[in-house]
Amino acid sequence: MRRRKGRISKTAPLRDEGAAGWENGYLEGRSDGYHYGLCESIYARAAPEAAPSRNIKVLYVKAEGSPYASLDQGIEEALRASVREVVVASPNDDVAQLAEAANPDLVLVLDAAGCSFKTEQVDRMRDGGLLTAVWLPDDPYHSDATADIARHYDYVFTIEANCVSMYRDIGCCRVFHLPFGVNPGFTRHVRVDETYRHDICFVGSAFWNRVAYFDEIADYLAAKRVKIIGYWWERLRHYEKLASRIEGVWMSPEETAKYYSGAKIVINLHRSADDKSHNSNSRNVPAHSVNPRLFEIASCAAFQLVDNRPELSQFYTPGVDIATFESPSDLVGKLDYYLTHDEERREIARRGLYRTVNEHTYRNRIQRLLSVIFG
């Protein structure tokens, strides 16, 4: 039986769609592979020459809370690469007794809000002739508490530049601004499956300024492939619009790096310094400095849109190795733009990765800390 001319097979459109889907997937996979290869090259060539190890012993007291896991890991690794010997302790240990036995050249404490290391132990160590330093990760949000803590130490390092004068005003003599950084060997770009691939990703708790932002752009986000990870997002007025995209959990640093690596855009929105429902900042110290997440996102070669803080330009150049936003409407406009400009987006992310590996690692920060104390 002869086939009629002009008859169209019912399977042809499906085959065409399948071929187009295969081609798009192939091109996207090839682009991802190319990006991954360039990132691996950057990790290898951007790292500066390691500084000589100092012939000193450091006792490091960890913060040991889930939000501080990547900080503890990065600081400990950097110390081990920078000094002769490192002894690590928990804030719940009898650190003063441990220090008496270990006799370190320096006791360094990462003091976390809500689970602070006992200042009585700091006083015991100082009375025994030991040199002490504290690195404060929650400034300026809990400055009421940290003001009482800081005066017990020989050296105070704060991630918020505006807190330096506050600590000096209350009698701390040796106070320095020292931002956090990242460990690129631990927090880095990885190849991921579809589970971690999204147009837009945000990782962090729903502080009220973030709630206001996300409520304003909820309709836009609901039309995109979005992932939001963190506590308290049920506070959203438009929670139902985004509920299926929200995972209300704490995410490990390893899992977080996978979500950063798989996202086209990561939003980084700092918390507010005047949120009285979460903060203890009665001096109203403004927040001008950047959060650790800034460096962690960049170290994953992820493109980030970050709210523009005064200190940001000391670390990255907007439009070159990072992108910024000023308002919810500006954020939506830039999300739209960069979601449709793949190569420009990835090029900015790779420049950010290079600068991070070259300038903003924990090894870099620890070298500065040790230089301040020991010269």
Protein language model features and the residues they cover:
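Catalytic binding pocket for nucleotide-activated donors in carbohydrate/polymer assembly enzymes
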Residues: 52-64, 70-90, 257-375
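Active-site regions of enzymes building and remodeling cell-envelope glycoconjugates
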Residues: 83-85, 153-157, 172-176, 238-251, ...
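Conserved catalytic-core segment of nucleotide-activated headgroup transferases in glycan assembly
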Residues: 192-265, 271, 275
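Helix-enriched interaction subdomains in cytosolic or periplasmic regions
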Residues: 1-38, 150-152, 161-170, 174-176
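Acidic, amphipathic alpha-helical patches
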Residues: 95, 121, 146, 253-256, ...
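Extended catalytic core of nucleotide-activated donor transferases of GT-like folds
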Residues: 35-173, 183-188
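Residues that mark the start of a beta-strand
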Residues: 55-60, 174, 197-199, 225, ...
